Amino acid sequence: MPSLDDILKPVAEAVKNGKKVTFFNGAGISTGAGIPDFRSPDTGLYANLAKLNLPFAEAVFDIDFFKEDPKPFYTLAEELYPGNFAPTKFHHFIKLLQDQGSLKRVYTQNIDTLERLAGVEDKYIVEAHGSFASNHCVDCHKEMTTETLKTYMKDKKIPSCQHCEGYVKPDIVFFGEGLPVKFFDLWEDDCEDVEVAIVAGTSLTVFPFASLPGEVNKKCLRVLVNKEKVGTFKHEPRKSDIIALHDCDIVAEKLCTLLGLDDKLNEVYEKEKIKYSKAETKETKMHEIEDKLKEEAHLKEDKHTTKVDKKEKQNDANDKELEQLIDKLKI
């Protein structure tokens, strides 16, 4: 059985020879960041939605259900919102290919924006299923700024449109909605020009994204990085296909080693870990301060209530004494 190095050498050689890489990413590239994928039996996102009391798991991303009850989505969004997670080594690997001019495009099913956080430029990214980068009202389609939406979420409120009071949601593509125009326009341009296709961390079950790896030209070197064979790699394999049934981050590490980028990968990854660790510590401290302020406010309120109660009791006593005095005077 060939080693992972042997499996990946042709990929590294293609990149060294000037071939550009197009990525087709799924949730599996972000599980190393702590974000659950969607369909794993025990750890997947859909497997952990029982607490939301949904009629069916996918309802959390169903546009008709959202219009009736957006609360389950926003309960989930608190956990998935960008800034809660740091990019993985795979995301940084993509950025390193961009830096050396070896990146063609990144087609991603993910809504976590970790490619952006790793520093991949917008012109390379096609978020097939949308993202948290912008937000609109589902009724009048007016835009809401990300800062405003975050304020609603922080206050545990459902974001509502300031124009028509309709529900606002991030521009994530829900079931029942069309994919972004950018997805179709760029794929029409890119389709015949894909030289190296790295398909990573995706089950290739959601169309039309799932059809993309099968549409690349016959000269394209297709690479699958996944836990199992999926899509056309399984049903319509090509002789030149490279199959790496390994963790996405491990494959990223190996490819960086073969390309002489391992030192850069480790450097940027450690630097980002420290940055996000500091940010997390700062956020934790902010939460602690907020909790302390709330506690102090409650204590003040309780003291004030106690004072008011005492004053009211004293007033009641005074009223009774006055009533008794009036009664005596009447006699």
Curated annotation (Swiss-Prot):
Stretches of the chain forming a coiled coil according to its record: 276-331
Keyword Repressor: yes
Swiss-Prot/TrEMBL keywords: Coiled coil, Cytoplasm, Metal-binding, NAD, Nucleus, Repressor, Transcription, Transcription regulation, Transferase, Zinc
Reactions it catalyzes: N(6)-acetyl-L-lysyl-[protein] + NAD(+) + H2O = 2''-O-acetyl-ADP-D-ribose + nicotinamide + L-lysyl-[protein]
EC number per UniProt: 2.3.1.286
Compartment(s): Cytoplasm; Nucleus
Lineage: superkingdom: Eukaryota
UniProt GO cellular component terms: chromosome, subtelomeric region; cytoplasm; mating-type region heterochromatin; nucleus; pericentric heterochromatin; rDNA heterochromatin
Sites where the protein binds NAD(+): 26-46, 109-112, 201-203, 226-228, 248
InterPro entries: DHS-like_NAD/FAD-binding_dom (IPR029035), NAD-dep_sirtuin_deacylases (IPR050134), Sirtuin (IPR003000), Sirtuin_cat_small_dom_sf (IPR026591), Sirtuin_class_I (IPR017328), Ssirtuin_cat_dom (IPR026590)
Record domain Deacetylase sirtuin-type: where: 1-262
Binding note for cofactor: Binds 1 zinc ion per subunit.
Function according to Swiss-Prot or TrEMBL: NAD-dependent histone deacetylase that is involved in nuclear silencing events. Derepresses subtelomeric silencing and increases repression in nucleolar (rDNA) silencing. Its function is negatively regulated by active nuclear export.
Family note: Belongs to the sirtuin family. Class I subfamily.
Descriptive protein name: NAD-dependent protein deacetylase HST2
